[in-house]
């Protein structure tokens, strides 16, 4: 009996020592600095296959721009700009919106970002949101022209002549350095109003005489999404809405190429959850935001934003209602489902007057 007790005690001792050793091993190999949560920028299409960063789902580290950095401690900092950045940070953390708020920092994104090395500025292009005027500002800053008035309209979007390099043209190290240290900004507007502007500009008026929108893209959308196949009218906004709200539109997007930049989401264009922007301007308050951005970038003494015609940046609910009139609630809800991330990231009110 005495031997049985000794044997039992020995077994308990072995088990106890094993548990202590396991705990010690766990503590020894635990990552003390939390490197498992270290954030990285993802470059999938610009780097060789072996250099792709796989599986990263974390948020980027806070960069340290060489220009003026937004800070909660600055007494002269208008709270609206801090609130916008805080809203983006909080929305990026919402797991339910991850598929609508996150994207890889791919070549498509890097192609949208224009570089001014002289003044350490990055500008992410968001078409139909005063993008042309901001490109003119950067063209002057880069030294291609001495004033905005001298820039020919046909040069602004000619990237072989306007002197604006894209971020994608730099090495991986050069890209990362600029993303971490430069002043970065982009402009947004109400997502649905932007889609209306894109439709009017590319399929109705087409002031730059870009025939591929009417002759190639429009017919492709009509063939796929028009309900009444006997109707011979050109593309209608209803066709456009069905295309944009279709979860299976990807094959058409691939055919349309980079022309889709005029209507894809801000998330797809600028990756706001992956890149820590210094300022996000709003088209609706551009009269105040443009001078503020120039000041924060440290260039307000060098260039001015072109004069903004009165009322042109105001949100026009009546126009939005008119364009969506007659479009089914199902199609509008599908459209909102795609752009919900943009609405929530940038604080735009859900358009219940269209959805309900």
Curated annotation (Swiss-Prot):
Assigned GO CC terms: Golgi membrane
Entry's transmembrane regions: 7-27
EC number of the protein: 2.8.2.-
Deletion consequences: Mice are viable, fertile and show normal cerebellar granule neuron migration. The anatomy of all major brain areas are histologically normal. However, basal synaptic transmission in pyramidal cells in the CA1 region of the hippocampus are increased and long-term potentiation evoked by theta-burst stimulation are reduced. Mice show an impaired long-term memory and a poorer spatial learning when a short inter-trial interval is used.
Catalytic activity annotation: 3-O-{beta-D-GlcA-(1->[3)-alpha-D-Xyl-(1->3)-beta-D-GlcA-(1->](n)-4)-beta-D-Xyl-(1->4)-Rib-ol-P-Rib-ol-P-3-beta-D-GalNAc-(1->3)-beta-D-GlcNAc-(1->4)-O-6-P-alpha-D-Man}-L-Thr-[protein] + 3'-phosphoadenylyl sulfate = 3-O-{O-3-S-beta-D-GlcA-(1->[3)-alpha-D-Xyl-(1->3)-beta-D-GlcA-(1->](n)-4)-beta-D-Xyl-(1->4)-Rib-ol-P-Rib-ol-P-3-beta-D-GalNAc-(1->3)-beta-D-GlcNAc-(1->4)-O-6-P-alpha-D-Man}-L-Thr-[protein] + adenosine 3',5'-bisphosphate + H(+); 17beta-estradiol 3-O-(beta-D-glucuronate) + 3'-phosphoadenylyl sulfate = 17beta-estradiol 3-O-(3-sulfo-beta-D-glucuronate) + adenosine 3',5'-bisphosphate + H(+); 17beta-estradiol 3-O-(beta-D-glucuronate) 17-sulfate + 3'-phosphoadenylyl sulfate = 17beta-estradiol 3-O-(3-sulfo-beta-D-glucuronate) 17-sulfate + adenosine 3',5'-bisphosphate + H(+); 17beta-estradiol 17-O-(beta-D-glucuronate) + 3'-phosphoadenylyl sulfate = 17beta-estradiol 17-O-(3-sulfo-beta-D-glucuronate) + adenosine 3',5'-bisphosphate + H(+)
Location in the cell: Golgi apparatus membrane
Any one GO BP annotation for this protein: carbohydrate biosynthetic process
Parts of the chain on the Lumenal side: 28-356
Function as written in the Swiss-Prot or TrEMBL entry: Catalyzes the transfer of sulfate from 3'-phosphoadenylyl sulfate (PAPS) to position 3 of terminal glucuronic acid of both protein- and lipid-linked oligosaccharides. Participates in biosynthesis of HNK-1 carbohydrate structure 3-O-sulfo-beta-D-GlcA-(1->3)-beta-D-Gal-(1->4)-D-GlcNAc-R, a sulfated glucuronyl-lactosaminyl residue carried by many neural recognition molecules, which is involved in cell interactions during ontogenetic development and in synaptic plasticity in the adult. May be indirectly involved in synapse plasticity of the hippocampus, via its role in HNK-1 biosynthesis.
Protein name: Carbohydrate sulfotransferase 10
Organism: Mus musculus
Taxonomic lineage: Eukaryota, Metazoa, Chordata, Craniata, Vertebrata
